[in-house]
């Protein structure tokens, strides 16, 4: 899969600072302003799946006789550049930076406030 992505004309892999379980706010697109938890990250495609955001409807036909068709609603992925980390405590969005603490452990913090995430 990585080889096929590299063959694309504009392939650019960016280090994702957003991780699964983070609370993010959508900053661009039809769901702009909504917040949700990251369910899944797709680093090779620079995309994230956020709970309750970018919902898509899928119509499923019956596969066996006697079974009824159904309509499924599921979250589609968003590009990572369209979401930003959201701090509940301060009620603001911020970029994330990495730093090494006094014990030599690499951690993340908010650039605006300096609040340590993990």
UniProtKB/Swiss-Prot annotation:
Gene Ontology BP, a term: translation
GO CC terms: ribonucleoprotein complex; ribosome
KW rRNA-binding (keyword) present: yes
InterPro entries for the chain: KOW, Rib_uL2_dom2, Ribosomal_uL24, Ribosomal_uL24_CS, Ribosomal_uL24_KOW, Translation_prot_SH3-like_sf
Matching SMART domains: KOW
Function as written in the Swiss-Prot or TrEMBL entry: One of two assembly initiator proteins, it binds directly to the 5'-end of the 23S rRNA, where it nucleates assembly of the 50S subunit. One of the proteins that surrounds the polypeptide exit tunnel on the outside of the subunit.
Family according to the record: Belongs to the universal ribosomal protein uL24 family.
Name of the protein: Large ribosomal subunit protein uL24
């Amino acid at each position: 899969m990585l080889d096929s992505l590299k063959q694309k004309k504009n392939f650019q892999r960016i280090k994702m600072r957003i991780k699964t379980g983070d609370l993010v706010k959508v900053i661009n697109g039809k769901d702009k302003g909504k917040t949700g938890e990251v369910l899944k990250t797709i680093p090779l495609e620079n995309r994230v799946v956020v709970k309750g955001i970018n919902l898509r409807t899928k119509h499923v036909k019956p596969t066996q006789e006697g079974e009824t068709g159904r309509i499924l609603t599921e979250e589609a992925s968003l590009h990572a550049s369209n979401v930003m980390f959201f701090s509940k405590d301060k009620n603001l969005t911020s970029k994330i930076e990495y730093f090494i603490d006094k014990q030599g452990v690499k951690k993340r913090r908010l650039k605006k406030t300096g609040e340590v995430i993990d």
